[in-house]
Amino acid sequence: TNFHAATRQAGMFSNAPDDNSLKTPYHASRMPTSSLPSATARHPLTVGPATVFSNNVRLFAYSGASMNTFDVVVIGGGPGGAKAAGILARGGKSVALVENSHLGGVCLNCGCIPTKLLLGATAPKGLLRGLERQRVAKGSIEVDYDALQKRIQRFIKGSAQALGKSLEQLGVTLIEGRAVCTGPTEVLVTNTDGSSQSLHAQHIILAGGSRSAAFPGMTPDHEAVLDSTDMLRIAAVPESLIVVGAGAIGLEMADFFSAMGSKVTIVEAAPHLAPTEDADVGLEMGKLLGKTGITCITGVKAASLTTSNGMATLALEDGRELTAAKALVAVGRTPNTDGLGAESAGCTLQARGYVTVDQCLMASPTVYAIGDINGQTLLAHAAEHQGAYVARHILGQQTTPYASGPIPSCVYGSLEIMRVGITARQALASGGKVEVARAQLMGNAIAQAGGDASGFVKIVWHNGALAGISALGHGVSHLVTAAQLLLLGQYHGDALHAFMFAHPTLDEALHAALEAPREVVTA
C-alpha cells in the first residue's frame, strides 16, 4: 500500500496535492534503528580503484560486498548534502555521500561562487563610474577575461578538493556515480565505469539540487541560446546579450557582461525587475540599471527564443523581435528528481517534480529531502540550514519541527538587493495593518564615500511588529546579517537603543530606516 495514500486517508496529510507542509511529521512512526544491521558490525569493505571527478576530487568506489550498509546514505554533494554528511559523521554515524557530478553542487561549480568571482572582478568598474560622476577620479580598468576564467576554475577545483578532503577526514565515504532509490532503505549506484553497487541505509537524504528551467519555445540549444552554466563558461564576452528573466541569476549575469562591454537587454514578463521584491525596489533597480546602459523591457512575455544564422532571436508577444549574439534563459529552476526513484522509496512528487516533505523535512518514514529538491527555498544557505537540521534530527538532537526563521536573500553586483523577512506585498496578502519606512542611502557617509549613494533601505511593519527589511544600492548585501539579527531580536522602538551601530558604517542606514516615519500602505 502506498504510504502517502494510507496516511492521507488517516488525516496525516493535507488534501492539497502540492501541500509542502504536512500535518504530522514522519518521525513519529519512523523505523527503529535497531531493525537494521549495525553499520559498525558490517563486513569489512575493500577499497577499489579510485575514481576522479572532473575537479580532481578523489571518490572511492567500493567493492568486496554485494550490499554496503551505512547508517545514512546522502544523495547529492552540494551545500545541503555535504553539511548533513559532515554533522552525521561527527555524530558517530556511518555515512556514504553519492555525487554524480561535482562536489559542492551548483553553488560552488556553476552558481553562487563563480558568479561572485566574476562580479568581484568588475566591481572596480562600478566604483570608478561613481567617482567619475563626482568628478574626483577618471581612468579605465581592463579585466582579462581569459585570466579571470582560469582563476575561477582554480578556485573551484581547490575548494572542491578541500571539501572532499574534509569529508573524508570525518569518515564520510565518498562515491562517484548516479544514485537511484530502489526501496525505502536501498540505493543503487551506477559508477562511472558502468559497474554498480547497492547501498543499504537506515536513512536516505535526498539532496540532489536543481538545474536551469526552460519553457516551451525557449529551450537552450547551447549555441546562441544559453543557460546559466553555459554563460559561466562562455569562451569570449559576446558583443550583445539578451537576458530573459530578471531574477537573481539574470540580474547578476546582466551586470557582469554589461561591465565587460556587452550591449545587454533584460526582458522580464513581470511589471518590474526582481519580481519577487516589492515594486518600488524593482522599479528603482530598472531606473538605475538604465543609467549604466542596460536596456530593461518589463511587462512583456517572450513568445520564442531561437538560434538563427548563429545569432539569438527573441520574439516578444507584443510583436517585437530582438536579436543578439547570445541569449541567456534565466527563468527559474527545476528539481533533479527525474530518474531518482524517489517514489520507490515511498516519496511523493508534486506536479513540478519537487519532493513533498513534512514538518521535519521527511518525505517518507526513512527518507528526508532537503534543499532545492523539496522546493521550499531555492538558496544554497537554506539547503545547508536544512541539512544541518536533518542531521541533528537523525542524531536525536533535534525533535521539534524544522523552522528556518527569516531567510536572508541577496542579488549581487554593482547594484545589489538585500532582503530578510517578508515584503509589503506579502504582508498585505496576509491581512492586518501594514506600514513601511525608508531611509535613502544618499544620507549615509559610507555610501557617499563609495562613489554611489543611490538606493534605500526599507522596513516593513506588520501589525506593529518588525516583519521585513530590504535594501537596494551599492554594497547593501553587507547589511543582510545585521538586518537578520535586528529582525530576529525585534529591535525597534525603545529596544533599538540596546543595539549600538558603529559610525560611520553602511549599517547606520538600517538604524535610520528603523527610526524613520512610518507610512500606512493599503495596496
What are these regions (language model features)?
Residues 8, 14, 21, 29-42, ...:
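Low-acidity, Ser/Thr- and Arg-rich intrinsically disordered low-complexity segments
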Residues 67-78, 239-244:
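Beta1/beta-strand and adjacent pyrophosphate-binding region of the FAD-binding site
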Residues 68-70, 87-93, 98-237, 265, ...:
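Glycine-rich flavin
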Residues 73-75, 179, 199-209, 244, ...:
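Short hydrophobic core segments
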Residues 75-80, 84-101, 106, 113, ...:
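Flexible, glycine-rich terminal cap/loop adjacent to redox cofactors
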Residues 112, 208-263, 267, 295-296, ...:
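Glycine-rich dinucleotide-binding loop and its adjacent helix/turn
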Residues 221-238, 321-396, 482:
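FAD-site-proximal beta/loop scaffold in flavoenzymes
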Residues 284, 370-426, 503, 507-523:
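A conserved FAD-binding loop/helix module that cradles the flavin
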